[in-house]
């Protein structure tokens, strides 16, 4: 993985602006500590930071290729999982290769198919190509949004980067947030509307979208979406296809020239990846596979079972390591480290995040990076197979199911900002826009229509939020994380499996469990879903409460402008329990909400953000 950034301006000679590009590139050092390079000519500048994973010596970027007299230059963040398939096809079409990297294959894919190259790619990617012949920039982002690509148009300049901080390093870009940005933070955060960058004027290429920037202007289009079709496969064929697609996705994503490990929580998703990876390692003579889990200091003492988290992960992890002979590493984070990483998590993400869910992941990825460069993780299974509790309620309610807190959020704002933002209307509009975009089957109505819309909401919003978190926290540790459940072939197939099949044996993710029979031990196979672990330690609550109290004592804190003083005081007095529902997701409440508000203060202060009230 890497960090990319660039600047295109057809009215300026940019070669003399390389110092600015150096600054923009340097902001992405954590994404690519192994190499750094800047390239430019006339109206374009590219910057690249590299984390070397495949073709260590030959994969330097920006990478240029002259083909039939025309020169093309690429910067690319990601990983292709069909590199050799593409290389073979392109060779048959007359292309020659000097290296073994997927970057060169991607560049030749663009040369051969131009904008249609994205239709041929299996992988996670965000990349930009300067096409000298056509005098334009082409850029694209992977189908599910695993890799980020932010951009802005400022005057005649088009600026972009893997992270917002690269764009903000340009002298013409100021850190501002307007009413729309604040509506995102307080109405929808820590998720955000697909395509928005929160900062005024900064946007993100949506998943499965591409763009060109030329003298004719900016053109953006969607190149992929799930398509709703009648599922005609038998149950047995469906099980076999799910198994085959998933096994192929995992196996393809194990390709690397550097050490690979897996996350392992003992849950269904990470265990499935671990089982297949361990078998592959055994077959290839690379065993044992190394696995990693995270736990919290004194969690055995303070763990609180709930409907969402009925039991601790520990015993399940032990079952997996024994069954597959993995070398397991249990990483235990202290409450101090958990609190201390909260501020840095904001700086890594460029936005307020999911409190300790982010900070623990950042710390965890740094522990893994001490010995590994690449890890596989189980994100996306719940979104595509229907694993979350809100898929299983008696009736599919309206509104974002992971966020039932709009009324409570509104009360937290000061009177003046309640009037300025109109959060309820804003949130509902975003919800309705997504429903209207959902690709439905002809004639689909009632519960079937509502359920398909629910899956689409999860894919576009909740899944991209978790992928966003995983990218930023892992790359903040210079660790590449791959997500086999986000393989677009698997997503396309599962999209049309009827709910009754997905719920085989009346179990959440029942079809996936059936597909994994014979691969996983039965007790792991039928373990109830449990989310990412959280701390219940009173020291964490104390730590974040003291942090927010210190912020409250600062007269110039933006929280005094935005929040209702009585609500803030009550939140601190009750250690977060005055806020009656989770701020976001299943477990983000109490001390997590306190930490999130402190992160909002940190964000405004660290980025010196001005509020544009117009």
From Swiss-Prot:
Binding site for ATP: 377-378
Keywords: Amino-acid biosynthesis, Asparagine biosynthesis, ATP-binding, Glutamine amidotransferase, Ligase, Nucleotide-binding, Sporulation
Annotated site location: Important for beta-aspartyl-AMP intermediate formation: 379
Active site per UniProt: 2
PROSITE patterns linked to this entry: GATASE_TYPE_2
Pfam families, per the entry: Asn_synthase, GATase_7
UniProt GO molecular function: asparagine synthase (glutamine-hydrolyzing) activity; ATP binding
Pathway of action: Amino-acid biosynthesis; L-asparagine biosynthesis; L-asparagine from L-aspartate (L-Gln route): step 1/1
Glutamine amidotransferase type-2 domain residues: 2-216
Ligand binding (L-glutamine): 50-54, 77-79, 102
Class of enzymatic activity (EC top level): ligase
GO biological process: L-asparagine biosynthetic process; sporulation resulting in formation of a cellular spore
UniProt EC number: 6.3.5.4
Family the UniProt entry places it in: Belongs to the asparagine synthetase family.
NCBIfam families: asn_synth_AEB
The protein, known as: Asparagine synthetase [glutamine-hydrolyzing] 3
Species: Bacillus subtilis (strain 168)
């Amino acid at each position: 993985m890497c960090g990319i950034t660039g600047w295109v301006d057809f009215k300026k000679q940019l070669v003399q602006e390389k110092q600015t590009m150096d600054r923009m590139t340097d902001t992405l050092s954590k994404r690519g500590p192994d190499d750094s390079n800047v390239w430019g000519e006339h109206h374009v500048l590219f910057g690249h930071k590299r984390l070397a994973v495949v073709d260590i010596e030959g994969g330097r970027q920006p990478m240029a290729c002259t083909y039939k007299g025309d020169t093309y230059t690429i910067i690319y963040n990601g990983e292709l999982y069909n590199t050799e398939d593409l290389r073979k096809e392109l060779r048959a079409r007359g292309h020659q290769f000097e290296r073994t990297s997927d970057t060169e294959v991607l560049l030749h894919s663009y040369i051969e198919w131009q904008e249609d190259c994205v239709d041929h790619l299996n992988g996670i990617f965000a990349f930009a190509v300067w096409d000298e012949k056509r005098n334009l920039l082409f850029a694209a982002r992977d189908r599910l949004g695993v890799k980020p690509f932010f951009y802005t148009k400022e005057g005649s300049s088009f600026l972009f980067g893997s992270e917002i901080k690269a764009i903000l390093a340009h002298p013409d870009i100021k850190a501002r947030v307007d009413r729309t940005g604040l509506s995102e933070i307080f109405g929808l955060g820590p998720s955000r509307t697909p395509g928005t960058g929160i900062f005024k004027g900064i946007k993100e290429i949506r998943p499965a979208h591409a763009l060109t920037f030329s003298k004719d202007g900016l053109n953006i289009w969607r190149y992929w979406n799930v398509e709703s079709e009648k599922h005609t496969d038998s149950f047995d064929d469906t099980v076999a296809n799910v198994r085959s697609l998933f096994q192929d996705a995992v196996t393809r994503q194990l390709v690397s020239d550097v050490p690979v490990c897996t996350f392992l929580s003992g849950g269904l998703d990470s265990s499935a990846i671990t089982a297949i990876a361990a078998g592959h390692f055994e077959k290839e003579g690379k065993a044992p596979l190394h696995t990693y889990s995270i736990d919290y200091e004194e969690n055995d003492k303070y763990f609180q079972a709930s409907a969402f988290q009925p039991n601790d992960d520990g015993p399940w992890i032990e079952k997996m390591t024994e069954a597959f002979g993995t070398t397991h590493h249990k990483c235990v984070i202290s409450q101090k480290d958990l609190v201390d990483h909260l501020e840095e998590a904001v700086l890594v993400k460029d936005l307020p995040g999911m409190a300790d869910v982010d900070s623990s992941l950042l710390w965890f990825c740094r522990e893994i990076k001490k010995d590994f460069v690449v890890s596989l993780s189980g994100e996306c299974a719940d979104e595509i197979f229907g694993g979350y509790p809100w898929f299983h309620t008696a009736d599919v309610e309206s509104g974002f199911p992971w966020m039932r807190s709009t009324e409570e959020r509104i009360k937290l704002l000061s009177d003046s900002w309640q009037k300025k933002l109109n959060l309820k209307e804003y949130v509902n509009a975003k919800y309705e826009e997504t429903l209207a975009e959902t690709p439905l089957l002809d004639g689909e109505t009632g519960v079937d229509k509502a359920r398909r819309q629910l899956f689409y909401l999860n894919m576009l919003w909740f899944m991209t939020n978790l992928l966003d978190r995983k990218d930023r926290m892992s790359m903040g540790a210079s660790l590449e994380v791959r997500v086999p459940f986000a393989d677009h072939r698997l997503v396309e197939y599962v999209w049309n499996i009827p709910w009754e099949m997905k719920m085989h044996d009346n179990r959440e993710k029942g079809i996936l469990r059936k597909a994994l029979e014979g691969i996983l031990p039965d007790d792991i196979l039928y373990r109830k879903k449990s989310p990412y672990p959280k701390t219940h330690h009173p020291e964490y609550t104390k730590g974040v409460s003291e942090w927010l109290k210190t912020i409250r004592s600062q007269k110039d804190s933006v929280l005094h402008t935005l929040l209702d003083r009585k609500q803030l005081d009550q939140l601190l007095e009750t250690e977060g329990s005055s806020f009656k529902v989770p701020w976001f997701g299943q477990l983000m409440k109490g001390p997590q909400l306190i930490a999130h508000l402190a992160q909002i203060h940190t964000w405004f202060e660290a980025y010196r953000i001005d509020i544009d009230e117009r």
